[in-house]
Amino acid sequence: MRNIGFISLVVAFLASCTSNGTTAPELTPFPEVSEPIAITQGPKDHLFASYYGINSWSPDNRYVTVLETDIIDRLSEDGEYATIGLIDLQDNNKFIPVAKTCCWNFQEAAMCHWLPWADDTFLYNDKREGKFVTVILNWKTGEEKIIPYPVSAVSRDGEWAVSINYARLRLSRPDYGYAGGGQDAMKDVSWPENDGLWLVNLKTGEAELIVSIASLKDQMTQMQDPKGLAYFCHTIISPNAKKIFWLARTVENLDAQAGFVSKWQTTSFTCDLDGGNVRRCFPDGWGGSHFNWKDDQTLAVTAKWEDRVYGHTIFTVGEEDKVQHIGAGILDFDGHCLFSPDGKFMSSDGYFNEYFERSWVMIRLEDQAVMPIGAFYVPEIYRNTYTRCDLHPRFRPDGAQIGFNSVHEGSRQVYIRNIEWK
């Protein structure tokens, strides 16, 4: 990591004094963030076992879920397994292998989530008997429960999950899908009636299609290509488990994009947990890319502000017309939005720049001041879009640590940083 100075402040959009010379309210100090501490090491590559923003720490904060793989510079194929392991933070970062999965990728890994309603238990996606499923595993006893739907998002209470079609995603966005045909990709149906968002009860295994792809045809970008595909991806459930945010996309000319799909159109949506009250988040042209819930009603989404420039936005569901452009100019990039547990700060990291460095900043939401907290070099072997190593940060639930993936020391490994809040 290039040391860019912890206390340097890039910009503050609000002055420290008001226009009439009176002193403004005292601002919350930025936290101290330690240098990165590697918790995995080679020769194999490692990454957190889930997408950014998802908690990887066990309830007692002793273990962290990671993925281990020999594959470096290509997508995995059907039957190629990665190892799911636990890093024991109290035993010299010992790697404990606990499961294997062939449903994984370099972006979302295997979508591991700890379940608060069962001791020593987490879930992950896998392929069993030819089908993509969720495995609920007690890693100490080895006891498993199979849910016949792969998860895309899990509620904080661990009771609900959203499932999408990862086989269709392998066609339309290969770096986020799974190989092996464990679901019907419906590749000959542009707007399927029987595919979309599935709400899954993780305790009973029951599931219901709550929003079909076809039902949103009139609200999504239209396609001229008869072989084009509409699909859903990237879902997240609100903290109180009452709302869902997701991205709906259309992609055309897949034959011409064979081997590297890079052009699609995005529409951002929210709905209630039961699929009701579907709302578009933005006007035409804004799209949507990365996102996170700040609280039960407020979202941050990187989108194309006024159809001009990608930036960070914050809005309240139901008041989308009051959307705010955060850090205009400084934060005009497509970053992974991540809120501190108290909601006062937002972390964001972007794609690598012309110097092949991934920058990482912390934003104080009170005044939109921005502080750099890192810049991480990307070696050539990790610059491919499909096998890239995004930082994909995630806070420990108590905010005392933040973890991320990085290749700045030559291989894909997992790091944590200690945080001291003031």
Task: Label each PLM-derived region with a short phrase.
Residues 37-82:
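Beta-strand-rich domains and repeat architectures in extracellular enzymes and scaffolds
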Residues 103-196, 210-226:
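Asp-box/WD-like beta-propeller blade repeats and closely related beta-sheet repeat scaffolds
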Residues 309-311, 327-369:
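Loop/turn-rich, solvent-exposed surfaces of beta-rich toroidal or solenoidal domains
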